[in-house]
Amino acid sequence: MAKQVFQTTFAGRELIVETGQVAKQANGSVVVRYGESTVLTAAVMSKKMATGDFFPLQVNYEEKMYAAGKFPGGFMKREGRPSTDATLTARLIDRPIRPMFAEGFRNEVQVINTVLSYDENASAPMAAMFGSSLALSISDIPFDGPIAGVQVGYVDGQIIINPSQEQAEQSLLELTVAGTKHAINMVESGAKELSEEIMLEALLKGHEAVKELIAFQEEIVAAVGKEKAEVELLHVDAELQAEIIAAYNSDLQKAVQVEEKLAREAATQVVKDQVTAVYEEKYADHEEFDRIMRDVAEILEQMEHAEVRRLITEDKVRPDGRKVDEIRPLDAVVDFLPRVHGSGLFTRGQTQALSVLTLAPMGETQIIDGLDPEYKKRFMHHYNFPQYSVGETGRYGAPGRREIGHGALGERALAQVLPSLEEFPYAIRLVAEVLESNGSSSQASICAGTLALMAGGVPIKAPVAGIAMGLISDGNNYTVLTDIQGLEDHFGDMDFKVAGTRDGITALQMDIKIQGITAEILTEALAQAKKARFEILDVIEATIPEVRPELAPTAPKIDTIKIDVDKIKIVIGKGGETIDKIIAETGVKIDIDEEGNVSIYSSDQDAINRAKEIIAGLVREAKVDEVYRAKVVRIEKFGAFVNLFDKTDALVHISEMAWTRTNRVEDLVEIGDEVDVKVIKIDEKGRIDASMKALLPRPPKPEHDEKGEKSERPHRPRHQKDYKPKKEFTETSKDSE
């Protein structure tokens, strides 16, 4: 295939697509240039159906540091495991693509996005999403696309598509919306307490922009697209299906309608085990035994799926007996743990999350060094989902993509209400431990996080709560569900998570299993979510009405002082020698920013005060008219040098030592003496003159005796060679050394 180039303008930037030049052995490949961001996307499909009961789709987003003209960090100087941002971007692309493959498609598909050049003002993730859809669409892989995605901002009351870096920093909204030309099928958002109306407007305008990109893709597919391959889809034997439904459907229906989760799971498993045993015995010697038993398992899954959906759409009954807009029982607890800086335990039905707060000096912030310029991340929200939370065994180790994604969602939801660095100069870490799960654990972690922050004395603007909405749709009719549980999530069509305060939304996330949802469904889901959010906030506020006024006793205390920027090097010292010495002596932690803000942390207030005194002394400057208790450190004929504080010395001229005339400095002071002095002058070079006599009472003028004669005083003959007329010193002499 010869190279072909397609070009358009989108959101004020050039969008160029190249095909037929690189990665030609892949089923489909494109180079997407958006602004100066360049992404290569290659899509590949396996030749045969994979084993397993799921569609093995893998989407990767690879950040090459050369794309931004940077070296990778670390000893190896080579890209390693994907960054958190790369993992989240891969999930962002996967989610709108996955619903676009046929039911029963089991061939393995890999979509690899490689960032070759990076322009921070032209979204590489959106170029990668565009490229992923297009590479699949022009390939022979049976992909029912195209899809596209855009980023949406909200600045000065205006909706902005694919905002620049500067606009993004000013925006009250960070939204990614993706979909087909007919409907939205993926949403990811953080927002600064925006209303449902503004969020809906942003979603709909984002979808209008998505349609533009899809039209451009369709033009390219028409020009270079391949014919789709014929692949085998997983299907079950129709006669076997009819036989099992006739014999066991009523038993499975009864089991599904058991309200309590564990009892329901046990009841359905009894039916499944019974059916499996019957057919294992019946077909034990059959040459296609494995295929038949796979079909039996799939048929039972389909029967359970159908019954759950029938109950909700026809009978308006949910598996646990709730109404469609009813929340499960709620419980909130603070101070679940001693010693930690804050903790909250939130329970919703059989979903339970424990959130633990840790506060630390700003030196503990996470340094993010990716394609964007390096920056420090002050707030971290980590989410852990152990297998015991669902009563199962399983893998333990590093967090997977799902845990990283759920942690990031909670982080976005809570970050919007955190105090500024000036108000609260701490690094903040929340860890959510999911202790039980029956759906919506990510939203439980947000509620638990709010409890932990408030209990820990972090002055958040307002409590945040989260709720997960679901959808059951048969094409003509639909039902929106509030607070979905695991079964409704598994067999439903939508998982729409909404978090926020009483004033507005702080985070959204939507994934669907159908090809899209309408504005009508979005509107209804947002309205139901708002009502539910307020109910949850009532419970949180009843548990802890307001943020505690003080931090936990175990949390590090902080004091901040401001120093001149040119004094920073004095506090740090050569090679960090001075600051390390202060830390060693006092046991505190110290952070200094480039603006001269010095933050001192410790759980011991006395240690903070001591460190503060030392630093204040290091950067202290003498001032005219200030009085100091000084130590004599050097004596010269013309006066004495005294140490005012730390490394700051002053000269007390001999004429400023006493009101009476003195010939020898040693007659008044010795090295090591401590004397009170007053600063009387600081010259342009910073040299300091001080006075002892300025702090002494001035003696009265000499008076005549009764005979009218003057009182005796030392007399020096005028003919003496070195005689000089006495003069009053009104200012001190300069250092004559």
From Swiss-Prot:
Any one cellular-component term (Gene Ontology): cytosol
Q: Which leading EC class covers this enzyme?
A: transferase
> What is the residue range of the signal peptide feature?
none
Ranges for domain S1 motif come to 625-693
- Composition-biased stretches, type Basic and acidic residues, lie in 700-737
Q: Pfam families annotated for this entry?
A: KH_1, PNPase, RNase_PH, RNase_PH_C, S1
**Reactions mediated catalytically:** RNA(n+1) + phosphate = RNA(n) + a ribonucleoside 5'-diphosphate
What highest taxon heads this organism's lineage?
A: Bacteria
Where does the record say this protein resides?
A: Cytoplasm
- Which segments carry the region annotation Disordered? 691-737
Name a single GO biological process.
RNA processing
Report the residue ranges that make up the KH domain in this protein: 556-615
**InterPro entries xref list:** ExoRNase_PH_dom1 (IPR001247), ExoRNase_PH_dom2 (IPR015847), ExoRNase_PH_dom2_sf (IPR036345), KH_dom (IPR004087), KH_dom_type_1 (IPR004088), KH_dom_type_1_sf (IPR036612), NA-bd_OB-fold (IPR012340), PNPase (IPR012162)
Described by its record, this protein's role is as follows:
Involved in mRNA degradation. Catalyzes the phosphorolysis of single-stranded polyribonucleotides processively in the 3'- to 5'-direction.
For this protein, the record's PANTHER family field holds: POLYRIBONUCLEOTIDE NUCLEOTIDYLTRANSFERASE (PTHR11252), POLYRIBONUCLEOTIDE NUCLEOTIDYLTRANSFERASE 1, MITOCHONDRIAL (PTHR11252:SF0)
What the record says about family reads:
Belongs to the polyribonucleotide nucleotidyltransferase family.
Name the UniProt record assigns to this protein? Polyribonucleotide nucleotidyltransferase
Its source organism is: Streptococcus pneumoniae serotype 4 (strain ATCC BAA-334 / TIGR4)
Lineage, uppermost ranks:
Bacteria, Bacillati, Bacillota, Bacilli, Lactobacillales
